[in-house]
Design a protein with these regions (language model features):
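Conserved RecA-like helicase motor core of SF1/SF2 enzymes
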Residues: 489-493, 497-501, 517, 523-574
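Conserved helix/coil segment N-terminal to the catalytic DExD/H
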Residues: 86-127
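Conserved pre-motif I regulatory segment
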Residues: 1-29
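Conserved interdomain linker/interface between the two RecA-like ATPase lobes of SF2 helicase motors
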Residues: 178-183, 188-260
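Post-DEXD/H (motif II) to motif III coupling segment of the RecA-like Helicase ATP-binding lobe
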Residues: 137-197
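Conserved helix-turn-beta segment of the N-terminal RecA-like "Helicase ATP-binding" lobe
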Residues: 64-85, 183-189, 265-268
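Conserved SF1/SF2 helicase motif Ia
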Residues: 45-66, 161-163
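Extended Lys/Arg-rich polyanion-binding regions
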Residues: 562-565, 571-589, 596, 601, ...
């Protein structure tokens, strides 16, 4: 390690390593790039030196490959490290089982291979000294519940071979890490949470894409999509030599963003080849149309300008290839300047002194000082100052990419002269921004409707504005050579699960080396992969949790340099709420990680797997939790296990591990096959097939577009053919729900809040076609697919008829009001529970058969529940208050995707009553809820 420049340990690294050396189970939860790897690597390598073995678990293959690369660079002959995952050639697996003493794998392989074949790994398990669970915050929801049971099975197998390994868990972002770690492993845990590592600053920008002139369902305004903005930004940043990761919510979206960004750079390459006159500066995408204003210094300043598929990502009204100037974004530009005031907004100005700006974009601020401006786009400055923000919507001709490219240039040029003044948020690292103490530093964070007060810097000398007209805004830095124009498009690629292993490793290497400057990726690269030298991260859509947001933002700046992270809002209630309420992000702790190992739908399959590995005994039951005995009895009654005097035995010839789909897809796999060639393109789980490869669906695979000719669920195949439709598709379903039992209830205003077990019946009934270039709906085609039944858990609230009668008398549509409130509530729940809106569903009705009252349900989309609805029950007042605020603060008249419309509504977003939903929620929230009974 000394040969690699490691001369000592930071205090938090030493503390965690020391606990592990003493045999204490420990979780280290510190900031991104804080050196957690060294904290567990030190005792792990020592274990190998002493003749022991180490098992390293990670959620992703990419992280395991990255860790293996780092281990091999140490050149320690006593450490025989190897990856054992689905990409490992079969001819290498025997050697790994017999000789490797540091095995890097994932929960899937542990579940399906290592534990069922534990006798083949007996030497490894007998000497197992340490289990490293890296990026453990990724183990949440149903997936986390499965992993918790897999770890319990691992402990049981180790006990069979006489070993009691020490567990070290690592996470950059975890709330109550010790509590979570105990729930995940079933073991008592020490925790290390004090981060003593040095950090560069990260500028966080919140961006709401502009409205277009188009109209969607019900005449609602259409906003430019987050993926379209991300593609433009990615192209612009790559053109500026800014190494960038763009996180996209879906595989299809990642492919589309990469294709679009490459197309834009192709246009730029053509323009450069045709018009280059010897200058070493690149033309900025769209700058030829930028307006300019003057900052307070008199310098000319540019004028104001998320693994599942989401409809917003894929139905894109402004992706390639629109007829416009070469790679033009045609949205103007924005100003980024440093000063003693901080203003982030759609005003065109920011300068030294406190500043005044109004508008929208990254954020809008008002205050007093030397400069003021109005406009659209983004403006950011750093320094000290206070203010309050206003909110309005940007126009379609604003330029996001110019804003952020100029902002990234500002970060670069200001770092040397004024390093302490560089940050829209004053926290020293992302963990501080996410921590509860950050509220003392942040008066209001950078985002629409906010300005930031950088505490402790009020007495600093005023730095010069960074919008120097001599600086190459949006182009290469002075002195850089012109890139080969023909190679520009090759600087961008896509990265996602489903690629061949060698292709993924080549992409990771190319990004590290700088051969690739921009990568559009799913969350496959969110965790831990060390890609030093990244300058910027684009996040297209709220990634689901604050933990994921800070984790993705932390991918940039890992080498200690300053960095830029941009959250681009999708057109849905949650994203819109966040960019208009940045206090929901900054100064807030990360969410509690929700998992439920006792879920019988999770526990049952793992008890079967455990019995198949080693027959279960009474002594094993405490390992699997308090409900294990009841679940075992049920498994015996189903004939899956047989009770004998000496324990429970697996009775089937099939593999018991096949009962548990730990990634939560469920059902059999549907093979996607090209009809003309028989080529296997990929596979999707059966529930997802109803919405992604139904007959008539548009299917994307590695940059190719296909049309689904026929979906045969019985045969398990979807036949597709190459096509180039000018539309995208997304499915719509209808849902019915019945109450099995209410576990808990308490009054909420004049109504009642419940949590309990329900049965949900869903059926995909049609799919929408949306024109790619314009975003307009061009068809709603019927489908004939079978219904699917799900027994799960839900939170629901009811209001009696005499309470809602006055609303009906005022002319509000009660069904439409409940429907609108349901949509918005689904959209906002991920802010309070560790979930995605696609992990949950909802049903609303003016009169439900089981309650006899107006009822709104929100349910977990996983069999047996995943803890999301229960979290909503616990936070109901906060959740529904935020829901009401999100609807009321939206500027539309009758409802739009930013507030009450849902892309997955099987009723075509009809009826919806926006004003009625506000009044309905006001009625429900008229008095605080009482304690739970």
């Amino acid at each position: 390690m000394a040969n690699r420049g490691v001369t000592g340990l930071w205090p938090h690294q030493y503390e965690a390593a020391d606990l592990a050396f003493r045999g204490r189970n420990v979780i280290i939860s510190t900031g991104t790039a804080s050196g957690k790897s060294l904290a567990y690597l030190t005792p792990a390598v020592a274990a190998c030196f002493d003749g022991g073995t180490v098992l390293y678990l990670t959620p992703t293959k990419a992280l395991a490959a990255d860790q293996l690369r780092g281990l091999r660079e140490l050149r320690i002959t006593q450490v025989r490290a190897a990856c054992f995952d689905g990409d490992t050639p079969f001819e290498e697996r025997t050697w790994i089982r017999q000789h490797a003493n540091y095995v890097l794998t994932n929960p899937d392989m542990l579940h399906r291979s290592l534990l069922p074949r534990h006798s083949q790994w007996s030497s490894f398990f007998r000497r197992l000294r340490m289990v490293v669970v890296d990026e453990c915050h990724g183990y949440r929801g149903v997936f986390g519940s499965h992993v918790a049971q897999i770890l319990r099975r691992l402990r049981r197998v180790c006990s069979r071979y006489g070993s009691r390994p020490t567990f070290i868990l690592a996470s950059a972002t975890a709330s109550e890490p010790g509590v979570f770690a105990k729930r995940l492993t079933g073991l008592e845990m020490d925790e290390v949470t004090t981060d003593s590592s040095p950090k560069g600053s990260t500028t966080i920008a919140l961006w709401e894409p502009p409205l277009t002139e188009l109209r969607g369902e019900g005449g609602a305004p259409v906003r430019r999509t987050a993926t379209a903005e991300a593609a433009d930004l990615l192209a612009d940043l790559v053109l500026a030599n800014v190494r960038t990761l763009a996180f996209i919510r879906s595989r299809r979206g990642a492919e589309t963003v990469a294709m679009s960004a490459r197309a834009k750079l192709q246009d730029v390459a053509f323009s450069l080849s045709a018009h280059h006159t010897g200058s070493h500066r690149h033309p900025h995408i769209g700058h030829s149309h930028a307006r300019h204003t003057t900052s307070s210094h008199g310098h000319p300043a540019p004028a104001a300008p998320t693994e599942r598929t989401t409809a917003q990502d894929d139905a894109d009204p402004s992706m390639p290839h629109e007829p416009r100037p070469p790679a033009s974004l045609n949205r103007g530009s924005a100003d980024a300047s440093t000063g003693t005031g901080v203003s982030a907004g759609t005003g065109a100005s920011a300068g030294t002194g406190a500043s005044t700006g109004t508008g929208t974009g990254v954020s809008a601020g008002t205050g007093t000082g030397a400069s003021g401006g109005t406009g659209t786009g983004a403006s950011a400055s750093t320094g000290t100052g206070t203010g309050t923000g206003g909110v309005s919507k940007p126009k379609a001709d604003t330029d996001l990419s110019a804003a952020v490219t100029d902002l990234s240039a500002a970060v670069t040029r200001s770092a040397a002269a004024h390093p302490s003044s560089l940050s829209l948020t004053p926290a020293e690292n992302l963990r501080d921004m996410a921590g509860p103490h950050a509220a003392t530093d942040i008066d209001a964070a950078a985002g629409p409707g906010a300005t930031a007060d950088l505490s402790g810097m009020a007495d600093q000398a005023t730095p010069a504005a960074v919008t120097d007209p001599a600086a190459p805004i949006g182009g290469l830095r002075d002195g850089a050579e012109l890139q080969d124009a023909a190679e520009l498009p090759d600087k961008i690629a896509a990265y996602r699960a489903g690629y061949l292993a060698e292709d993924r490793r080549l992409l990771e290497k190319a990004l590290r080396s700088g051969t690739i400057m921009g990568l559009a990726t799913t969350n496959a690269l969110e965790l831990g992969v060390d890609v030093s030298g990244l300058d910027a991260v684009l996040i297209a859509g709220w990634p689901g949790t604050r933990a994921s947001l800070w984790q993705q933002a932390g991918r940039a700046g890992r080498a200690g340099q300053d960095a830029l992270a941009v959250l681009i809002a999708r057109d849905d209630p949650l994203d819109t709420y966040i960019v208009h309420h940045p206090d929901a992000l900054f100064g807030q702790p990360v969410e509690a990680i929700v998992l439920d190992p006792d879920n019988p739908y999770v526990l049952g399959p793992h008890l079967c797997a455990a019995a198949a590995e080693i027959p279960l005994t009474e002594d094993d039951l405490p390992t699997f939790g308090d409900t294990a005995a009841d679940v075992l009895a049920d498994l015996v009654s189903q004939g899956l296990l047989r009770r004998r005097p000496n324990g429970w035995f697996w009775t089937k010839r099939e593999r018991a591990t096949d009962l548990a789909d730990i990634r939560g897809g469920g059902g059999t796999l549907i093979q996607v096959v090209e009809s003309s060639t028989g080529r296997l393109l990929g596979s999707v789980d059966e529930p997802s097939a109803h919405t992604t490869v139904h007959t008539g669906a548009v299917y994307l695979h590695q940059g190719e577009t296909f049309l689904v000719e026929h979906l045969d669920l019985d045969a398990g195949v979807a036949l597709v053919s190459g096509a180039a439709p000018d539309y995208s598709t997304f499915a719509r379903d209808i849902t019915d729900i019945s109450i099995i039992s209410a576990h808990r209830s308490h009054p909420l205003g004049p109504g009642t809040l419940h949590f309990g077990e329900v049965e949900v019946t869903r059926q995909v009934v049609s799919y929408l076609k949306r024109r790619i270039q314009s975003g307009e709906m061009v068809g709603d085609e019927p489908l004939d697919l079978p219904p699917r039944t799900l027994r799960t858990r839900a939170v629901w609230w009811t209001l009696p008829a005499d309470v809602v009668a006055p609303l009906a008398e005022q002319g509000f549509d009660l069904g439409g009001s409940a429907h609108a409130a349901e949509h918005a509530a689904i959209g906002l729940l991920p802010l309070f529970a560790t979930c995605d809106r696609w992990d949950i569903g909802g049903v609303s009705t003016e009169l439900h058969a089981d309650t006899g009252q107006l009822t709104v349900f929100v349910y977990d989309g996983h069999a047996g529940g995943a803890g999301f609805a229960e979290r909503g029950y616990a936070r109901a007042t906060d959740w529904l208050t935020a829901t009401r605020e999100a609807i009321a603060s939206c500027e539309c008249d009758r409802g739009c995707p930013s507030c009450i419309q849902s892309p997955k509504c099987g009723n075509g977003n009809d009826p919806l009553d926006k004003r009625g939903a506000i009044h309905l929620l006001d009625t429900l929230l008229t008095s605080p809820s009482t304690s739970t009974t």
